[in-house]
């Protein structure tokens, strides 16, 4: 039986999100899967299906030893190694560095002699970064550098682990007694609100997140709960964790409605049972969202602040995301939102309509995205609200570029999605990108020429460095050359030649590869032009209508 260890020293939401990969690995058959997490995440890890063993690191104990002056640093390291002994003394067929951070990379490197293969980043014997999978480069060097990431983390993790996604299988463990209690209580709430034979939908509202930057503003919550309570079709219930802070927040909102809002309190063990019985979860970016994805509960994420929904949004076919327009999102800090209570309720009612032909009318600078799947996995497409066509075209074409460069295939539905923006807009955008590529190719050829001349003339080295720096600036651009340039930059940092000649040869190879990759973009732009020429109407996304409450 194959033995797999997943190192996941990330946050609680990432532990739950890893269940997608764990389920896919288990679907391959005859595999024993273990995970390494921080001790505070052990309860979440133990709730995941298909886990044989959960190993933990007590980081608080290690931090105490490291920070207390009466102990030597050696004591902290000794404690860490003691906690790692059971893992190191086993043989693993595959170790997956799910963390892809410094600590996870060190630990993956520490046990590399105990495994036949490491998926993800690790350090070699000379303490140099090693990457044995091009998708790891995508994860670490491209997705992290692009605010509008073209690929979801879940899909990238599957590629890193060389595992196809499996849509079949249970991902989280639930307790039958807890399931029955939750079903009975929530059904009682439904019956109590039933009028004229209409069975109302129970909508769970998650209040708090791990960061105040992502929390739903209390006034926004009050506004959309007020509107929900006016509708005979909706029953809002507040979801909280069992702690005094969240209780006080929930009580404040409930008191605003004369205690007329149901509050459901659940811990990590009972949360899956509660979510399984809801008709919809309205939530900011939380671990609760990831649990809902595992239970099959529909999710409407209200994405605010630092929430990176394009790469860590809800992972399910029926997911919706309500956000301020992408060009107004900073993803780096707090920002006032244009989302209103009416936007939320209109979107909720849209979710429960069968045909989805009438789109909700949203406030200015607010966009509603829906989840779709293609050959790369999940992505989000605007279905209503304010849309910047150039931003959407660039975002989708970057996804197309990733597909071509990393898996040598085009995604036909992306061309169809871009067609919705209108022929003239697409044509002008493509012309501008071709102009950008022309300038990029000039800089690339200048860099290549300086490199070759530098082999014969040492005084040309400064010219090469200057040209290379100019070329690498494209890695910070918002142009289509960004993805291939980031890929080039990532590979450049991995060059390990021992002589100037070896390094020069490797750089030359990478420059020619970069040139080839950019030429592929020109082919994609030509295909886009041909597809856009078939468009007869303008932007279908703006065809919206108001949903009455």
Label every model-predicted segment.
Residues 1-549:
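Catalytic machinery of carbohydrate-active enzymes
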């Amino acid at each position: 039986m194959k033995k797999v260890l997943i190192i996941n020293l990330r946050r609680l939401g990432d532990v739950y999100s890893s269940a997608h990969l764990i389920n896919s690995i288990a679907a391959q058959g005859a595999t024993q899967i273990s995970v390494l997490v921080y001790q505070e995440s052990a309860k979440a890890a133990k709730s995941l299906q298909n886990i044989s063993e959960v190993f933990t690191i007590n980081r608080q104990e290690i931090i105490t030893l490291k920070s207390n002056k009466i102990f030597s640093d050696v004591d902290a390291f000794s404690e860490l190694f003691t906690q790692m002994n059971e893992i190191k003394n086993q043989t693993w067929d595959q170790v997956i560095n799910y963390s892809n951070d410094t600590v996870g990379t060190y630990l993956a490197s520490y046990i590399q002699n105990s495994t036949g293969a490491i998926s993800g980043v690790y350090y070699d014997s000379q303490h140099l970064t090693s990457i044995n999978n091009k998708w790891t480069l995508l994860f670490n060097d491209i997705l992290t550098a692009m605010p509008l990431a073209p690929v979801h983390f879940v899909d990238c993790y599957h590629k890193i682990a060389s595992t196809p996604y499996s849509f079949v299988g249970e991902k989280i463990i639930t307790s039958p007694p807890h399931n029955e209690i939750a079903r009975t209580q929530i059904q009682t709430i439904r019956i109590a609100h039933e009028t004229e034979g209409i069975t109302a939908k129970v909508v769970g509202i998650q209040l708090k997140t791990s960061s105040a930057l992502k929390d739903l503003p209390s006034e926004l919550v009050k506004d959309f709960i007020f509107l929900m309570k006016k509708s005979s079709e909706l029953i809002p219930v507040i979801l909280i964790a069992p702690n005094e802070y969240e209780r006080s927040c929930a009580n404040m909102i409930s008191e605003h409605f004369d205690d007329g809002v149901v509050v459901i309190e659940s811990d990590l063990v009972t949360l899956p049972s509660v979510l399984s019985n809801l008709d919809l979860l309205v939530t900011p970016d939380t671990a609760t969202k990831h649990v809902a994805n595992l239970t099959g509960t529909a999710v409407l994420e209200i994405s605010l602040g630092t929430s990176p929904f394009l790469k860590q949004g809800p992972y399910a076919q029926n997911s919706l995301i309500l956000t301020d327009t992408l060009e107004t999102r900073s993803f780096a800090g707090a920002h006032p939102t244009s989302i209103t209570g009416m936007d939320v309720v209109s979107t909720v009612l849209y979710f429960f309509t069968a045909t989805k032909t009438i789109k909700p009318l949203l406030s200015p600078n607010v966009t509603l995205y829906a989840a779709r799947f293609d050959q790369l996995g999940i992505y989000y497409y605007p279905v209503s609200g304010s849309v910047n066509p150039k931003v959407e075209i660039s975002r989708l074409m970057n996804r197309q570029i990733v597909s071509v460069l990393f898996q040598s295939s085009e995604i036909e539905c992306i061309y169809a999605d871009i067609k919705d923006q209108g022929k003239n807009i697409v044509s002008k955008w493509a012309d501008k990108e071709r102009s950008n590529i022309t300038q990029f190719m000039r800089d690339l050829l200048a860099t290549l020429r300086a490199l070759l001349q530098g082999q014969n003339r040492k005084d040309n080295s400064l010219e090469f460095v200057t040209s290379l720096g100019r070329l690498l600036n494209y890695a910070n651009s918002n142009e289509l050359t960004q993805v291939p340039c980031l890929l080039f930059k990532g590979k450049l940092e991995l060059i390990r030649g021992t002589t100037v000649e070896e390094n020069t040869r490797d750089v030359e190879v990478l420059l020619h590869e970069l040139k080839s990759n950019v030429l592929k973009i020109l082919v994609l732009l030509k295909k886009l032009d041909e597809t856009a020429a078939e468009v007869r109407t303008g932007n279908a996304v703006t065809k919206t209508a108001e949903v009455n409450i």
